[in-house]
């Protein structure tokens, strides 16, 4: 049985931990409002750009479609871009994204495909490297970035374009977590390359409906200057950056939401533990007082 001093030390330790978790919860909650607003505000732009691009692609000959849109024409080598958080303490947020990526990896390997992995975020790299280190070809570290912006998305998209130009892969799929609410983040897979169809070209079943929500744009007739091929050459790489930027924003919002929930649960658990330890401390203290009183009374009677 723990002594009174041990119980006091444990209570003090748990209280100190509770202060930390409450502080982290407050910080995450303060950031959540800003990043949630950013993610939700950027969605219409990303959705409409993808829809317009898909519509424009129908007005150009196949031979004039940029390679990033039409792909290589093969389906043999798959590049999986897995975006997770750089830090932990956010519940199962990172594990859910990694689990979705694992499912896709297993399905592709079972189908005889070649899989290559590009990770964005330390936690995803740590998780996937346990089983698929040999498949990981590169990693993008964003730990030094205080606030994710379009510049980081452009770096990632340029890395993907460089790999594509080197004929490193045929199909590219982006994995991230779509922010639904503070307590709900949905891991999804989105087809980046080829991007000739609204849903991209992935074998995943839960591809986000970024374009399906804008089907009304497909009936619009466009005029192009100088010509549609030149327009696509400019729009396609930018659309790649835009979709990645949206994924990064969704990820940050999801991470903060998961962190708020995780720290709230941790604070509640700490409170319950403090109550249990306090009860144990009071019982042991009362038992010790009772024992001392009995010894005093017994000594007095002996005299």
Swiss-Prot record:
Q: What does the UniProt keyword field contain?
A: ATP synthesis, Cell inner membrane, Cell membrane, CF(1), Hydrogen ion transport, Ion transport, Membrane, Transport
Swiss-Prot/TrEMBL GO biological process terms: proton motive force-driven plasma membrane ATP synthesis
For this record, the Gene Ontology CC terms, alphabetical, are: plasma membrane; proton-transporting ATP synthase complex
Gene3D superfamilies in alphabetical order: 3.40.1380.10, ATP synthase, gamma subunit, helix hairpin domain
Which InterPro entries would you find in this protein's record? ATP_synth_F1_ATPase_gsu, ATP_synth_F1_gsu, ATP_synth_F1_gsu_CS
Q: Name one Pfam family in it.
A: ATP-synt
Q: Quaternary structure?
A: F-type ATPases have 2 components, CF(1) - the catalytic core - and CF(0) - the membrane proton channel. CF(1) has five subunits: alpha(3), beta(3), gamma(1), delta(1), epsilon(1). CF(0) has three main subunits: a, b and c.
Query: Mind telling me which NCBIfam families this protein's record contains?
Result: ATPsyn_F1gamma, PRK05621.1-4
* PANTHER family for the chain: ATP SYNTHASE GAMMA CHAIN (PTHR11693), ATP SYNTHASE SUBUNIT GAMMA, MITOCHONDRIAL (PTHR11693:SF22)
Q: What is this protein called?
A: ATP synthase gamma chain
Q: Which organism is it from?
A: Bartonella quintana (strain Toulouse) (Rochalimaea quintana)
**Gene of origin?**
atpG
